[in-house]
Amino acid sequence: MRKTHPVNALKKLGIGLAFGAATIMSMPTSALACTQIYMGKNLTADGNTYYGRAEDYGKRYLKHFGIEDSHAPGFTYSSDESGFVYTSNKTTYRYSYVRDHPSQWDERWDAYSEAGINEKGVSCSATLSTSMNADVEAVDPLTDGLGEYSYASVILGESATAREGVELIGSLIDEQGVCSHDQIVIADNNETWLFAALSGHQWIAMKLADDVASVNPNIGNLNYDVDLDDTENCLHSEKIQSMPEEKGIAKYSADGKFDVAQTYGERLDKTGRHQWTRYIQGRDYFKNPLTKDADYTIVNDGSVGASVSEIQPLFFKPGKSGWSTFELIRAFGNRGENVPGLNANIDGAYAIGTERNTEINLFQIRRGLDPEVATIQWEMLSRAAYSVAIPLYSALMTEVSPYFSDQTVSFDHCAEKDIVNNEEPENSINYVLMDISSLCFENPDTLGISVRAYLDALQNELIEQNKEVDAAMLAETTTEGRTALANKAGNAATENTYKKCKALLQEMREYQKAGNFDEPFTPSDLNTETNGLKESITYAEDALATDPVTPDQPGAPEQPGNPDQPGTPEQPGTPEKPSEKPGKDDTTTTVTTNKKNTKGNLPTTGDRFDGRMVATFAIAGVAIISAGGYILYRRKKA
């Protein structure tokens, strides 16, 4: 989840009184808003482990999937949120990432790598921001050290195993401290770890069990039982227990055992109502619901939310097993539809599948397989309520589909108000999914229902056809052959998704332009009897084709006909590869300036801020107003 974020325009001199006041008034009442999910392999239909996270920030915020190449020894990681610096003493590993647009980070291109897999098969989702309590903050405050801007880049660039990633991050916190408190999931083909930065210099990491699930919407004090002496399953800072005991602030469970979560986490009365709303929605989705009135109370004083009567567990047993890939993808789009009083569609409550989602990642881990092929990254670059997750063998990929807009695309379309008449930049799955989602959130009754049904049909076909691709991947024994297939499959999955979604978006625009809303919109490619696609995608066929294929010439897609008439819409052309952007040589030793990127010589960079500090911002806002707005403003991302 996002935290600190410098906005260039707001950092300049002369921010006015009116703007400063408006900024403060617009701040959310619940600043933290990301959701992390874990499902152990004993609970899934395919026997695989799943974990992932939804990042929330704003309604229209551009994200980019890409590949960071390896670098020679001497490469330096740095941050745009703190003074953190770390220089590698070895050749770094290639890894996939999901990053921000450089225009939002002082033109740095490495902003917040967030989620990916490296060439060793280590995956990471970072971060879920949490909060420490005031007692801990007084004795071990945050530092100018490591933070979420750099976590994923360092873990994926440096670690050959998940445990190695945990140990590296822990050692860096020991040395430099942290500038934010976060949870991170780090995994490989054998282990999945939950890492938590608890305070300025204290941390813990727990190897996750195969028979539990977890939903965490930024709550740092969810209960868990851990044996600090079990080094096989728990790693931690040296003074995790002795420091709070020496300071007289340690907390203990009923049986007298040192309680990490209650010692370090925020107090129950300090946790946000929107956080508990999402926790309740998540527990309901996974069929282990909390009971209204007994476990929680709905609060509505102008903002609908929930409060709980006592601290809840970090891990729980779902009410069923056999969870499917589709169900776990859709968990991130959950809007509390089955929770009376906390249904985002009816009651206006915050939701896991909020309109503020910017990116969702889900990692599917096949325990014991070769690290190169063990993990599949399911990636959504827009809001989960109306989006599609694309399967990617990211550990092997060395190139990225041109339908994923790279960081050279304009950020301007994010601010577009009339997306019916003003189309997104050409051949951009990022913007197409953003625009589909915006139209559905604005028109849930006329567009949302059938579009969701269509996207579900598309998602199911991607899942089913990926099984065929996966069989071929597992049959391939060489890294060279696997890499070629991973690149080809990534291109095929992305292109098929783009073409279906672009045609859908064009039909949605035509429906809106026609202005006849007597009948809800129905996509021409949706079979309303089977809720499947009329014309299947060709993902598996394209990925496994042996004959060379000549790509279409790029160009603007044809406009489809009347969406009321069944038929197959025209497909857009294949885009050109993005033009190269001058960059520094691969031997560069800092990420603060340009460096090579496999989509053209793209530069790279940066990350975030402490999400607990709404009150602090309000105080700072008074200073902004009284000083006429001359301040370095830092915008929150959640």
What does each model-identified segment do?
Residues 2-17:
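Bacterial N-terminal signal peptides that target proteins for export
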Residues 21-31:
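C-terminal segment of classical bacterial N-terminal signal peptides
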Residues 299-409:
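Long, well-ordered mid-to-C-terminal structural blocks that present hydrophobic/aromatic surfaces
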Residues 381-388, 392-545:
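Charged low-complexity "KEKE/polyampholyte" interaction tracts
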Residues 540-609:
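C-terminal low-complexity, Ser/Thr- and acidic/Pro-rich disordered "stalk" regions positioned immediately N-terminal
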Residues 606-619:
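Juxtamembrane/start-of-transmembrane alpha-helix segments at the extracytoplasmic/lumenal side
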